[in-house]
Amino acid sequence: NCIGEQVPCDENDPRCCSGLVVLKKTLHGIWIKSSYCYKCK
């Protein structure tokens, strides 16, 4: 079971699906506490 794109995940144990990378999400320059899985660009 892997975590899909733009889904919150644990940065220490992300389990993102293949081809995805863990990124910290920003909102108007403010770091949101959770990490998300995103596609590599």
From Swiss-Prot:
Cysteines engaged in disulfide bonds, as pairs: C2-C16, C9-C37, C17-C40
Tissue specificity field: Expressed by the venom gland.
UniProt GO molecular function: sodium channel inhibitor activity; toxin activity
GO cellular-component term (any): extracellular region
Annotated transmembrane regions: none
Species annotation: Cyriopagopus schmidti
InterPro entries: Hwtx-2-like (IPR012625), Toxin_22 (IPR012627)
This protein's name: U3-theraphotoxin-Hs1a
Family that this chain belongs to: Belongs to the neurotoxin 14 (magi-1) family. 01 (HNTX-16) subfamily.
Cellular localisation: Secreted
